[in-house]
Amino acid sequence: MTNPHADRLIAFLISSGISDQRVLDAIYRLPRESFVSQAMMHQAYDNNALPIGQGQTISQPYIVAKMTELLDLKSDSNVLEIGTGSGYQTAVLAQIVDHVYSVERIKSLQWDAKRRLKQLDIYNVSTKHGDGWLGWEAKGPFDAIIVTAAAESVPQALLSQLKEGGKMIIPVGEEEQQLLKIERQGEQYLSTVVEMVRFVPLVAGDLA
């Protein structure tokens, strides 16, 4: 069954330069309305960030697609997501790789995301309630790390959990941020500015 809203979104993403078919297919298959409140459902397929409670947002689809594409994922990539949020970005990743590890500092958001993923029969995800600044060392090192909140500086713990040749996509800055692509080469980390973005802040610590 076709979804005209999803068709329009995919056409917009392609016109915006997204070309990885796996990313486009993952976004097309996912019912974005399942990740927002009932009051926001009519905007689910718009290219906008939407509030999900607790001062957090679900990122605009273009940013989800762009960040995912930049990771250059393979099916066996070991992936860490910092900031589970609604679980939408998590679900996109889970359709491309065998397993996703995701850390969320707000307990209620973590539980809501787990429930949504289960309802959509997405089981190849492990979530953890914890401090995103610290990553998830026990499950590393990672081929890819995606950070869905803005850090004032790149957390050292996340750099150390990146595999040789691994990539991290992270927004860095205060009000307006640079979206950085960081690649590990030995003990060097090569950083490229992708574009300017706006994300909620990556807050240290966890919240019950």
Curated annotation (Swiss-Prot):
Active site (catalytic residues): S59
Metal-binding as UniProt keyword: no
Function: Catalyzes the methyl esterification of L-isoaspartyl residues in peptides and proteins that result from spontaneous decomposition of normal L-aspartyl and L-asparaginyl residues. It plays a role in the repair and/or degradation of damaged proteins.
Organism, as annotated: Vibrio campbellii (strain ATCC BAA-1116)
InterPro entries the UniProt entry points to: PCMT, SAM-dependent_MTases_sf
Top-level EC class as recorded in UniProt: transferase
GO BP annotation list: methylation; protein modification process; protein repair
Gene that specifies this protein: pcm
Protein name per UniProt: Protein-L-isoaspartate O-methyltransferase
Family as reported in the entry's similarity comment: Belongs to the methyltransferase superfamily. L-isoaspartyl/D-aspartyl protein methyltransferase family.
Catalytic activity: [protein]-L-isoaspartate + S-adenosyl-L-methionine = [protein]-L-isoaspartate alpha-methyl ester + S-adenosyl-L-homocysteine
Pfam families to which the protein is assigned, alphabetical: PCMT
Keywords assigned by UniProt, alphabetized: Cytoplasm, Methyltransferase, S-adenosyl-L-methionine, Transferase
EC number: 2.1.1.77
Location of the protein in the cell: Cytoplasm
GO CC, alphabetical: cytoplasm
Primary location: cytoplasm
An example molecular function term from Gene Ontology annotations: protein-L-isoaspartate (D-aspartate) O-methyltransferase activity
